[in-house]
Swiss-Prot record:
One of its GO terms (cellular component) is cytoplasm. It catalyses: deamido-NAD(+) + NH4(+) + ATP = AMP + diphosphate + NAD(+) + H(+). Catalyzes the ATP-dependent amidation of deamido-NAD to form NAD. Uses ammonia as a nitrogen source. InterPro entries: NAD/GMP_synthase, NAD_synthase, NH(3)-dep_NAD(+)_synth, Rossmann-like_a/b/a_fold. The gene is nadE. It is an enzyme of class 6 (ligase). Mg(2+) binds at residues 37, 139. One of its GO terms (molecular function) is NAD+ synthase (glutamine-hydrolyzing) activity. SUPFAM superfamilies: Adenine nucleotide alpha hydrolases-like. The lineage of its organism: Archaea, Methanobacteriati, Methanobacteriota, Stenosarchaea group, Methanomicrobia. The keyword Repeat does not apply. Its EC number is 6.3.1.5. This is NH(3)-dependent NAD(+) synthetase.
Length: 248
């Protein structure tokens, strides 16, 4: 079991090295939120190309839990990677001056995710780095992400891993206990949690996804019906934009 896990981790690190070398970039930038997904992605990057080439960016807003920033700082110190903090409230305030601006949790959450993506790519462009994605398979299959926001990246090291697999690997690379034990949250508004918003635990989501994939995407339980409905509604997030471009 340990050998199999080591092989799977080695494959991820090799993919990161390939993306890095092939791009001729000078490093990697990863948004470190204080959550387990970004923690594991950052750890993989440090293991693959060395922590001195990896920049961790925390992009909190006033609604963010202060403990998340503290956990992100601890993670970066443990991994030996550089850490910077950019508060996104001034950018949010600028958007709120747009005539007709409407503020709802849904609209503001998507806006925050896209602002964070823009800041990550600004630093990547400035420092000749790649942006590392932090989406896992469970989120990707459900479409639990912001299009052109937190799903935007130059490579995705953990998108093939179910959330339950993420926890398994995070324990293996010694991610801090505070990160492993916290409630998963996108941090888009105070008190928000992934499982509360979706209405299922990640254990239930992953079990449903595995059963659906094994049974030709035919739901057999209420949980599977809920997961399938969400996956179908958000299929556009997993696909390229429709187009008529033909490349020989």
């Amino acid at each position: 079991m340990a050998q199999e896990l080591g092989c799977r981790m080695g494959q991820v690190e090799q993919m990161i090295r390939y993306a890095y070398w092939n791009s001729k970039s000078q490093g990697i930038v990863v948004g470190v939120s204080g959550g387990v997904d970004s923690a594991l992605a950052a750890a993989f990057c440090c293991r693959a190309i060395g922590p001195e080439k990896v920049l961790g960016l925390s992009l909190p807003a006033s609604v963010s839990n202060p403990q998340d920033l503290s956990d992100a700082q601890e993670l970066c110190a443990m991994l030996g990677m550089e850490h910077r903090v950019v508060l996104i409230d001034p950018m949010l305030a600028a958007f709120k001056t747009i005539p007709g601006f409407v503020e709802t949790p849904y609209l503001l959450g998507n806006l925050m995710a896209r602002i964070r993506m823009t800041v990550l790519y600004y630093h990547a462009n400035r420092d000749h780095r790649l942006v590392c994605g932090t989406s896992n398979r469970s989120e990707a299959m459900l479409g639990y992400c912001t299009k052109y926001g937190d799903n935007a990246a130059d490579f995705q090291p953990i998108v093939h891993l179910y959330k339950t697999d993420v926890y398994e690997m995070a324990k293996e690379v010694k991610i801090p206990k505070a990160i492993l034990e916290k409630t998963p949250s996108a941090g888009l508004w105070a008190g928000q949690s992934d499982e509360g918003e979706i209405g299922l635990s990640y254990a239930e989501i992953d079990a449903a996804l595995k059963n659906l994939e094994a049974n030709g995407w035919k739901a057999g339980t209420p949980s599977e019906e809920k997961v399938l409905s969400r996956a179908q509604a958000n299929a556009h997030k997993r696909l390229a934009a429709p187009n008529l471009l033909s490349v020989p």
